[in-house]
Regions:
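Terminal alpha-helical segments
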Residues: 1-103
């Protein structure tokens, strides 16, 4: 797979995960925790897929001696993936707080 396709796939998966996390936060605020949990799981799966792409298609190839062309698109994909991972961490904590408040 070429690096441009990998970058777009990572961005797409991370973007979908981010949208699911934002929905999960909204539903948690409303006390709809079963729906929230399903969205958190879906987001986690999307992030795992993006991470797998990053590892198999970029990092492993580079580690095996292939010289990948660096470009802004790859940088954006990496950044978007990592910021979405951060959002996931924060969302899980905020949702835990909503669970306590809604008891």
């Amino acid at each position: 797979m070429n690096t441009e396709k990998v970058a777009f796939d990572i961005i797409s998966l991370a973007g979908d995960a981010k949208a699911e996390l934002q929905k999960a936060l909204k539903l948690a605020r409303e006390g709809k925790f079963s729906e929230t949990d399903a969205l958190l799981e879906k987001a986690s799966e999307q992030l795992q897929q993006a991470h797998k792409l990053q590892t198999q298609e970029l990092l492993t190839r580079e580690a095996n001696g292939e010289k990948l062309q660096f470009n802004v698109l790859i940088s954006h994909a990496q950044d978007y993936l990592m910021t979405t991972y951060t959002l996931e961490d924060v969302a899980v904590e905020i949702i835990s707080l909503y669970r306590l408040i809604k008891k």
